[in-house]
Amino acid sequence: MRTEPDRKSSYGRSMTQTQQAQKILVTGATGTVGRQVVAELLARGHTVRALTRDPATADFPAGVEVVRGDLTDPDSLVPALVGVTGVHLITFGGAYFAPLETGPRILELARAAGVRRVTVLHGGEATPLEQAVRADGRVDWTVIMPVEFMGNALEWADGIVTAGEVREPFVSRLSAMVHEGDIGAVAAVALTEEGHGSQEYVITGPELLTVGDKVATIAAARGRDIALVELTEEEAVAQWRAAGHPEDVIGFLLEAYGNTPEVGRTVADTVEKVTGRPARTFGQWAAEHADTFRAG
């Protein structure tokens, strides 16, 4: 069952008001969420060590210590774990992003290195690594469970720029989509502050939006109208196949969009409770990315 803090406590205060700087290891650091965790930790004054299989292409801001490692080979993490107090984990790894079976060994190494806190980015199902973390009683763990990313709207950019339109099925579906930066902010607090052990945080934005709402918001941000073309399921499947999506992904999209689970269309106040500030709106996200939706 999801649990949440029942008071704001010191959540959301700057690091200098509440604690000393800490060193945090971020795995999956080059991913969409990983980069936001890195950015938020830096903004709060902490030291970040970013794990990647290819440091040469990581492209992190100055001040981030980039180290080589692979979650499918836990012993490769030993140097990266030295001196860190917290670790952000993902549940998939390797070249084909298979569910990680290495959770118990990763946790064993983390405990031996003195790690006190672990966050896990939920992978959409009960993965072996997440199960191993939940079963561990010797570190403070927090499971981070975001709903649909606002960044998914970037998939519309080509159609908007070239044809001034968005072509989607299920246009009346509701989503409590979340700004990726807010995912990073919640993870950063859980990794560096007390009071988040054994917690499962569902992270959403502050509003429910239809596809039409999102399109109108992007249109306002870019300063030009966008047509919304509703597709049938058959037309949507054909479009996704033409885009190269495999059949299992198409099946997932049909289920997620055609029968959005309640958790994905219910606003939660987790961001404000944990960070002390409101969750960012889709309007804010659209303003940040307005140029992406403009021609030229």
What is the meaning of each model-derived region?
Residues 2, 10, 16-62, 72-84, ...:
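Oxidoreductase cofactor-interface core, primarily capturing Rossmann-like NAD(P)-dependent enzymes
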